[in-house]
Protein backbone atom coordinates (compact mmCIF):
# COMPACT_ATOMS: atom_id res chain seq x y z
CA UNK A 1 0.00 0.00 0.00
CA UNK A 2 1.48 3.33 -1.08
CA UNK A 3 2.18 5.84 1.65
CA UNK A 4 0.49 9.21 1.41
CA UNK A 5 2.85 12.09 0.65
CA UNK A 6 4.04 14.03 3.66
CA UNK A 7 2.82 17.61 3.64
CA UNK A 8 5.53 20.12 4.38
CA UNK A 9 4.73 22.00 7.53
CA UNK A 10 5.91 25.45 8.48
CA UNK A 11 8.53 25.60 11.21
CA UNK A 12 7.21 26.28 14.73
CA UNK A 13 6.60 30.00 15.12
CA UNK A 14 6.50 30.57 11.36
CA UNK A 15 2.84 29.76 10.67
CA UNK A 16 1.00 32.85 9.44
CA UNK A 17 -2.31 32.35 11.25
CA UNK A 18 -1.35 33.72 14.67
CA UNK A 19 0.42 36.73 13.16
CA UNK A 20 -2.63 37.48 11.02
CA UNK A 21 -4.98 37.33 14.03
CA UNK A 22 -2.71 39.54 16.12
CA UNK A 23 -2.26 42.02 13.27
CA UNK A 24 -6.03 42.20 12.75
CA UNK A 25 -6.48 42.98 16.46
CA UNK A 26 -3.84 45.73 16.52
CA UNK A 27 -5.22 47.39 13.40
CA UNK A 28 -8.80 47.19 14.71
CA UNK A 29 -7.81 48.85 17.98
CA UNK A 30 -5.76 51.53 16.21
CA UNK A 31 -8.62 52.35 13.84
CA UNK A 32 -11.02 52.63 16.78
CA UNK A 33 -8.69 54.91 18.74
CA UNK A 34 -8.61 57.35 15.83
CA UNK A 35 -12.18 58.52 16.40
CA UNK A 36 -11.89 58.61 20.20
CA UNK A 37 -9.43 61.50 19.98
CA UNK A 38 -11.78 63.79 18.02
CA UNK A 39 -13.00 66.54 20.40
CA UNK A 40 -16.62 66.28 21.51
CA UNK A 41 -18.97 69.10 22.56
CA UNK A 42 -19.25 69.11 26.34
CA UNK A 43 -20.29 72.65 27.28
CA UNK A 44 -23.84 73.18 28.50
CA UNK A 45 -24.38 76.11 26.12
CA UNK A 46 -24.83 73.61 23.27
CA UNK A 47 -28.18 72.62 24.76
CA UNK A 48 -31.32 74.75 24.34
CA UNK A 49 -32.59 76.05 27.66
CA UNK A 50 -31.20 77.98 30.62
CA UNK A 51 -31.15 81.19 28.64
CA UNK A 52 -29.86 79.55 25.44
CA UNK A 53 -32.32 79.56 22.55
CA UNK A 54 -32.56 76.69 20.12
CA UNK A 55 -31.18 78.90 17.34
CA UNK A 56 -28.15 79.84 19.46
CA UNK A 57 -27.55 76.22 20.46
CA UNK A 58 -27.69 75.08 16.83
CA UNK A 59 -25.32 77.85 15.76
CA UNK A 60 -22.82 77.12 18.53
CA UNK A 61 -22.83 73.37 17.92
CA UNK A 62 -22.48 73.85 14.16
CA UNK A 63 -19.51 76.17 14.64
CA UNK A 64 -17.91 73.75 17.09
CA UNK A 65 -18.22 70.81 14.67
CA UNK A 66 -17.01 72.92 11.74
CA UNK A 67 -13.99 73.96 13.82
CA UNK A 68 -13.00 70.28 14.07
CA UNK A 69 -12.75 69.95 10.29
CA UNK A 70 -9.01 69.23 10.36
CA UNK A 71 -9.55 66.52 12.99
CA UNK A 72 -12.20 64.82 10.86
CA UNK A 73 -9.97 65.04 7.80
CA UNK A 74 -7.02 63.54 9.69
CA UNK A 75 -9.28 60.77 10.99
CA UNK A 76 -10.53 59.82 7.52
CA UNK A 77 -7.03 59.94 6.04
CA UNK A 78 -5.45 57.83 8.80
CA UNK A 79 -8.34 55.35 8.76
CA UNK A 80 -7.99 54.98 4.98
CA UNK A 81 -4.24 54.40 5.27
CA UNK A 82 -4.67 51.75 7.96
CA UNK A 83 -7.41 50.08 5.94
CA UNK A 84 -5.21 49.96 2.81
CA UNK A 85 -2.24 48.52 4.72
CA UNK A 86 -4.48 45.98 6.45
CA UNK A 87 -6.10 45.00 3.16
CA UNK A 88 -2.73 44.50 1.44
CA UNK A 89 -1.55 42.50 4.45
CA UNK A 90 -4.63 40.28 4.13
CA UNK A 91 -3.98 39.72 0.42
CA UNK A 92 -0.34 38.87 1.10
CA UNK A 93 -1.15 36.19 3.65
CA UNK A 94 -3.56 34.55 1.24
CA UNK A 95 -0.52 33.98 -0.99
CA UNK A 96 2.09 32.58 1.42
CA UNK A 97 2.57 29.12 2.91
CA UNK A 98 4.60 30.29 5.89
CA UNK A 99 6.51 33.27 7.25
CA UNK A 100 10.24 33.80 7.07
CA UNK A 101 12.18 35.09 10.06
CA UNK A 102 12.61 38.46 8.33
CA UNK A 103 8.87 38.78 7.75
CA UNK A 104 8.16 38.06 11.41
CA UNK A 105 10.76 40.61 12.50
CA UNK A 106 9.32 43.31 10.25
CA UNK A 107 5.94 42.91 11.92
CA UNK A 108 7.34 44.51 15.07
CA UNK A 109 7.83 47.99 13.53
CA UNK A 110 4.70 47.52 11.39
CA UNK A 111 2.45 46.95 14.41
CA UNK A 112 4.36 49.48 16.51
CA UNK A 113 3.64 52.21 13.97
CA UNK A 114 0.05 51.10 13.40
CA UNK A 115 -0.65 51.33 17.14
CA UNK A 116 1.19 54.67 17.33
CA UNK A 117 -0.60 56.31 14.38
CA UNK A 118 -3.57 57.65 16.43
CA UNK A 119 -1.16 59.97 18.28
CA UNK A 120 0.28 61.88 15.28
CA UNK A 121 -3.23 61.83 13.78
CA UNK A 122 -4.54 63.67 16.83
CA UNK A 123 -1.66 66.15 16.71
CA UNK A 124 -2.11 66.94 13.00
CA UNK A 125 -5.87 67.18 13.56
CA UNK A 126 -5.43 69.82 16.26
CA UNK A 127 -2.49 71.69 14.73
CA UNK A 128 -2.81 71.19 10.97
CA UNK A 129 -0.78 74.32 10.19
CA UNK A 130 2.19 73.34 12.36
CA UNK A 131 5.12 71.87 10.37
CA UNK A 132 6.13 69.66 13.31
CA UNK A 133 2.69 68.02 13.29
CA UNK A 134 2.90 67.43 9.53
CA UNK A 135 6.45 66.10 9.84
CA UNK A 136 5.48 63.62 12.57
CA UNK A 137 2.44 62.33 10.70
CA UNK A 138 4.44 61.93 7.48
CA UNK A 139 7.18 59.96 9.23
CA UNK A 140 4.69 57.66 10.98
CA UNK A 141 2.76 56.86 7.81
CA UNK A 142 5.92 56.63 5.70
CA UNK A 143 7.42 54.15 8.16
CA UNK A 144 4.22 52.11 8.15
CA UNK A 145 4.16 51.95 4.35
CA UNK A 146 7.86 51.05 4.25
CA UNK A 147 7.34 48.14 6.65
CA UNK A 148 4.46 46.87 4.54
CA UNK A 149 6.61 47.06 1.41
CA UNK A 150 9.56 45.28 3.01
CA UNK A 151 7.33 42.45 4.23
CA UNK A 152 6.06 41.92 0.69
CA UNK A 153 9.60 42.07 -0.66
CA UNK A 154 10.82 39.47 1.82
CA UNK A 155 7.91 37.18 0.96
CA UNK A 156 9.10 37.24 -2.65
CA UNK A 157 12.79 36.81 -1.87
CA UNK A 158 12.45 34.21 0.88
CA UNK A 159 10.51 31.73 -1.26
CA UNK A 160 7.39 31.49 0.88
CA UNK A 161 4.86 32.28 -1.86
CA UNK A 162 2.42 29.55 -2.83
CA UNK A 163 3.21 27.72 -6.11
CA UNK A 164 0.25 29.20 -7.99
CA UNK A 165 1.18 32.84 -7.24
CA UNK A 166 2.22 34.86 -10.29
CA UNK A 167 5.74 35.99 -9.32
CA UNK A 168 5.94 38.66 -12.00
CA UNK A 169 2.65 40.22 -10.95
CA UNK A 170 3.68 40.05 -7.30
CA UNK A 171 6.98 41.76 -8.12
CA UNK A 172 5.06 44.51 -9.91
CA UNK A 173 2.98 45.12 -6.79
CA UNK A 174 6.14 45.35 -4.68
CA UNK A 175 7.56 47.92 -7.10
CA UNK A 176 4.38 50.00 -6.93
CA UNK A 177 4.47 49.80 -3.14
CA UNK A 178 8.04 51.12 -3.13
CA UNK A 179 7.03 54.02 -5.38
CA UNK A 180 4.09 54.96 -3.15
CA UNK A 181 6.28 54.79 -0.05
CA UNK A 182 8.92 56.97 -1.69
CA UNK A 183 6.26 59.48 -2.73
CA UNK A 184 4.86 59.69 0.78
CA UNK A 185 8.30 60.18 2.35
CA UNK A 186 9.09 62.79 -0.31
CA UNK A 187 6.25 64.91 1.07
CA UNK A 188 8.49 65.53 4.10
CA UNK A 189 9.97 68.45 2.16
CA UNK A 190 6.48 69.98 2.04
CA UNK A 191 5.92 69.74 5.79
CA UNK A 192 6.94 73.37 6.31
CA UNK A 193 4.04 74.44 4.12
CA UNK A 194 1.44 72.69 6.24
CA UNK A 195 -1.51 72.43 5.85
CA UNK A 196 -0.96 72.47 2.05
CA UNK A 197 0.92 69.19 2.36
CA UNK A 198 -2.51 67.62 2.99
CA UNK A 199 -3.21 68.02 -0.71
CA UNK A 200 -0.15 65.93 -1.57
CA UNK A 201 -1.29 63.24 0.86
CA UNK A 202 -4.72 63.01 -0.74
CA UNK A 203 -3.06 62.35 -4.11
CA UNK A 204 -1.46 59.12 -2.88
CA UNK A 205 -4.10 56.87 -4.45
CA UNK A 206 -3.72 58.66 -7.78
CA UNK A 207 0.06 58.24 -7.63
CA UNK A 208 -0.41 54.53 -6.85
CA UNK A 209 -2.70 54.05 -9.84
CA UNK A 210 -0.35 55.89 -12.21
CA UNK A 211 2.61 53.88 -10.90
CA UNK A 212 0.70 50.61 -11.28
CA UNK A 213 -0.16 51.31 -14.91
CA UNK A 214 3.42 52.34 -15.68
CA UNK A 215 4.88 49.22 -14.06
CA UNK A 216 2.42 46.93 -15.85
CA UNK A 217 3.13 48.64 -19.18
CA UNK A 218 6.87 48.22 -18.66
CA UNK A 219 6.49 44.55 -17.72
CA UNK A 220 4.43 43.89 -20.86
CA UNK A 221 7.07 45.64 -22.99
CA UNK A 222 9.79 43.41 -21.52
CA UNK A 223 7.68 40.35 -22.29
CA UNK A 224 7.35 41.37 -25.92
CA UNK A 225 11.09 42.01 -26.22
CA UNK A 226 11.85 38.61 -24.71
Residue ranges and their predicted role:
Residues 2-226:
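Multi-pass alpha-helical transmembrane bundle typical of ion/small-solute transporters
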Amino acid sequence: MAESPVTKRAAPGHTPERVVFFTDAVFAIAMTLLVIEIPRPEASDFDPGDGVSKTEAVSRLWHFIAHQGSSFFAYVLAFYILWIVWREHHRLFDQVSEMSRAMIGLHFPLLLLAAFLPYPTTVIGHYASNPVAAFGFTLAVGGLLLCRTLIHMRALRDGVLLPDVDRQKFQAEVTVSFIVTAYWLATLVLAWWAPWVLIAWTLTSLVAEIARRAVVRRAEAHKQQA
